[in-house]
């Protein structure tokens, strides 16, 4: 199902499911809050304060680059990540703390392209012409650590958000930990610093 959860279904004080924007009700034994920056709004409905800011990032996906790259690269000095994805190439970068503002900054886009081309001189700005940029918000917690674990006072609700720039990298480990918590197992690692 692809729809936003907008509220919780309760039996007394216990959360037993979610209501979606389309008006559907979905019940479950466990509810996982894993909506990135959008988790803030939903968590408030539980009386939970989950401080996060949106960290705006940009990317371009070149559908069939004229030069094929085979390895992922993190260009630290240029603040750009390069990810080959099948026949396409994703070039991403920047981190702009912005709340929920998803407006596009031409200066930031230009910086991503210029830095990429500086490290990969076989590419030029012309390779990016006509490519629509993507903009998204990373969920940034104040200390950079994700919110991961049972929500206090809500035994059936588990949080898994706030991974900043490491969401995709930490997804396998986060999924593994959430699976342990959902199945009722004790966490194999201490999560108290992540609460």
Feature roles, as predicted:
Residues 10-12, 145-195:
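C-terminal lid/capping helical subdomain adjacent to the catalytic/cofactor pocket in oxidative enzymes
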């Amino acid at each position: 199902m692809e729809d936003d959860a907008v509220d919780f279904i309760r039996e007394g004080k216990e959360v037993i499911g979610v209501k979606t924007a389309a008006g559907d009700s979905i019940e479950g034994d466990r509810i996982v809050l894993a909506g990135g920056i959008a988790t803030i709004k939903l968590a408030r409905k539980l009386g939970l304060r989950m401080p996060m800011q949106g960290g705006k990032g940009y990317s371009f996906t070149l559908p069939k680059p004229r030069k094929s790259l085979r390895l992922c690269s993190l260009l630290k000095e240029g603040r750009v990540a390069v990810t080959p994805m099948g026949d396409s190439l994703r070039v991403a970068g920047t981190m702009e703390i912005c709340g929920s503002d998803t407006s596009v900054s031409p200066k930031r886009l230009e910086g991503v392209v210029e830095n990429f081309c500086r490290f990969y001189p076989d590419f030029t700005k012309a390779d990016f012409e006509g490519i629509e940029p993507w903009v998204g918000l990373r969920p940034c917690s104040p200390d950079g650590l994700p919110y991961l674990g049972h929500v206090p006072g809500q035994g059936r609700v588990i949080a898994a958000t706030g991974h900043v720039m490491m969401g995709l990298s930490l997804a396998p480990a986060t999924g593994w930990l959430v699976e342990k918590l959902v199945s009722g197992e004790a966490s194999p690692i201490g999560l108290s610093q992540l609460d």
